[in-house]
Amino acid sequence: MWIDNKIFKEDMEYIIHANFINWENLNNKTIFITGVTGLIGYYLTSSLVYKNIKEDSNIKILALVRDIEKAKLQFKEQLKVDNNLSFICGDLNNIPSISEKIDYIIHGASPTTSRLFIENPVEVIQSIINGSQNILELAKSKNIKSMVYLSSMEVYGEYKTEEVLKENSVLKLNPNNIRDCYPLGKALVENISKAYFKEYELPVNILRISQTIGVKENVELIKNRKIIQEIIYCILNKKDIVLATKGESKRTYIYIRDVITAILLVLLSNKHGEIYNVANEKTYDSIYNMINNVIENVANNEINLLIKEEKTNKYPKTNYLKLSSKKLKEIGWSPSVDLIEMFRRVFSCNIK
């Protein structure tokens, strides 16, 4: 997906003109990014490329990828217009030597497939912890200006009451629950990052990101669709949406472009050692209600929501993640898209 797509271009324009981001700090600088082939990484990298071609910002982008050919294919349109984007072949457990100066780091690579949390928990937690420490060591050796670690709302764990979750709220995670290998790993990396800030004065910040709404490719082409992708796929094909749980968990959501502006704002701020929630507080609702809302307002009630519960532990237990983004708003950020508009935009992106 690139700027020939109207919605995608609008998002790029919004990001590069967000006046609360200190964009000038990125001019003629080098930024190292992990996780560029995921949704957030793709949008982030594309926005930097777009900034370069629109305003000649000369931001050099070094992207760590496991498969260069796959990355080149995914970013083929961006590579045609900007020679500041380059790929480094490697993974988090084996980062190759990098001779270039690095000014900024955004670490977004992480396992995100729920099935892996149950089937390969050792590999998941090792990848999260060991890989992230390798990135922190790279940041330390390069004497960077700033780093952002992309964490998750899942670190808050199993909240059974609907209290507002602030960055200093207790994390309710259970080491006896194998699926918690993911949020436990993310939480430990948060602690390791804070330790690097305390002991080595490494300028790192952490973002706990809500359920993100967005797409980077046509959902028809995705084999193993996640919940948001499945909703869009079903609307496009006029198929009923089938939930494997009752959908009772409640959470906040966030549109992809608002995630990117949060990342860049925090990356280029002068405060470090901080944790920020990234959420559109007005979107807080149950999964069940959210889907019904989308069916009514985006699918025009042409499809139904069906519940077919599966006896499995690959999904989180019912919980309530009501994130507050007050702290992030206090440094200038604000969300720009409400829940229904998020889905309308994603739906429009996929219409042939």
Where do the model's predicted regions map?
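Active-site segment of SDR-like NAD(P)-dependent oxidoreductases
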Residues: 111-115, 153-160, 210-213
